[in-house]
A protein has these predicted regions:
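Short amphipathic alpha-helical coupling segments at ligand-binding clamshell hinges
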Residues: 85, 227-230, 298-310, 318-319
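Immediate post-signal peptide segment of exported/extracytoplasmic ligand-binding proteins
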Residues: 39-72, 91, 194-200
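Extracytoplasmic ligand-binding site segments that recognize negatively charged/polar headgroups
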Residues: 72-87, 98-116, 120-254
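A ligand-binding cleft/hinge motif common to bilobed small-molecule-binding domains
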Residues: 131-135, 256-275
């Protein structure tokens, strides 16, 4: 009996030791992945390469990226698109593995902020929406970087201080289901959305902050808020932050009109014969997706290499060809079904383009539309 008890105790001790060893192994792995002290910071790498000739600069980045072996990207780019972009990068640089976390724009910010507060800096680059990218800057988590590729980009597509650079742009349109709304009765401007006949028949996203801020700037804060409050009284459907989801619900007849829909997806569905069409309102706003280089990047060479590649002729062309996204680099050809979106100049919605602060915009948006228990 004593022998049996001792044997059981010995087995329990060995099991506990094994579990404890496993825990410590995972802790060590996490520290190794997230510890920014293992190598040069992004700022140090940028300082080192800033005076190099283009060929030498590229070689330095490639050699550093080979040593680092990976780049970690947090993004809000759609599930159908971002894997194609990352795969194209890996084809160009097979020695750099891309690891990605995908969420909503606000979800990306929450994760980066939570990890930073815990002292874990896993992310190298964030590719997300303007308001959320600006929030990361305000949290002092972004390091300024002016890519040499910026010289070939459209005016207004990068921050002069280097805290963000757009890599694509999505025009904002009013989409409507052509089985439910005829071409003749479809709204022609924002005031038409306040007509009683559209009450309960329209949708809006829960995080359309950039569109909201652009209209407040155009109308003026007071008049803009009056308009938005009137719009909120139209019993809008607000199923979530995804424009793609709202367009799919529109096609299914859940709503007749989608306000602030992303034009690229709408134009794509239209080109495939879906019962959908769109209007280009004034202001014809367009929302960019932005790159931000993280201050505590643990793979800075690979991060800068990815940043430059996505803005390059090769990266922008492959992004456009593979996903249909609208490039911000001059001279890139776009798919035929996008041409209708490109026939009119659009207002580039960036953090610097708005007079209101990002927190004020998000707070007002939540309050006006009664989101998250708020109402103003």
């Amino acid at each position: 009996m004593i022998s049996s008890t001792r044997a059981k105790s010995s087995r329990r001790a060995r099991t506990s030791a094994t579990l404890l060893l496993g825990v410590w192994i995972w802790v060590l792995i996490d520290v190794i992945i997230a510890d920014p002290a293992r190598g040069a910071t992004a700022g140090e790498v940028l300082k080192k390469i800033q005076s190099l000739a283009p060929a030498q600069r590229r070689t330095a980045l490639e050699e550093g990226a080979k040593s680092e072996g990976q780049v970690v990207i947090y993004t809000s780019v759609s599930l159908s698109d971002y894997p194609k972009i990352l795969a194209a990068f890996e084809q160009s640089y097979p020695y750099v593995k891309t690891n990605a976390f995908r969420s909503t724009p606000s979800g990306v910010v929450r994760r980066v902020d939570t990890e930073a507060k815990a002292g874990r800096h896993a992310v190298d680059i964030v590719a997300s929406a303007p308001v959320e990218t600006w929030q990361l800057r305000q949290l002092q988590l972004v390091t300024p970087y002016l890519s040499p590729e910026r010289k070939a980009l459209f005016k207004g597509s990068f921050d002069p201080e280097g805290y963000w650079t757009a890599f694509d742009v999505t025009p904002i349109v009013l989409a409507f289901n052509t089985k439910l709304v005829s071409q003749q009765e479809a709204p022609k401007n924002y005031q038409d959305l306040l007509l009683p006949k559209w009450k309960g028949k329209m949708s809006l996203g829960t995080e359309d902050y950039e569109w909201f801020g652009a209209l407040l700037d155009l109308m003026g804060k007071d008049k803009g808020l009056d308009y938005m409050r009137a719009l909120a009284k139209q019993n809008l459907h607000m199923p979530g932050s995804s424009s793609v989801m709202r367009v799919q619900l529109l096609l299914g007849g859940e709503s007749a009109i989608a306000i602030a829909a992303r034009g690229r997806r709408v134009a794509e569905f239209k080109s495939k014969g879906a019962p959908i069409d769109f209007r280009l309102f004034d202001p014809y706003a367009a929302e960019p997706d932005m790159l931000a280089l993280m201050q505590h990047s643990t793979h800075p060479h690979a991060a800068i290499l990815f940043y430059d590649w996505l803005l390059s002729q090769d990266g922008q062309s492959k992004m456009s060809d593979l996903t249909g996204r609208i490039a911000v680099r001059k001279g890139v050809r776009h798919l035929p079904w996008l041409q209708e979106l490109l026939q009119k100049d659009f207002l580039f919605m960036t953090p610097a383009a708005k007079t209101l602060g990002t927190k004020e915009i998000t707070d007002l948006y939540h309050g006006v539309f009664g989101l998250y228990g708020t109402k103003k």
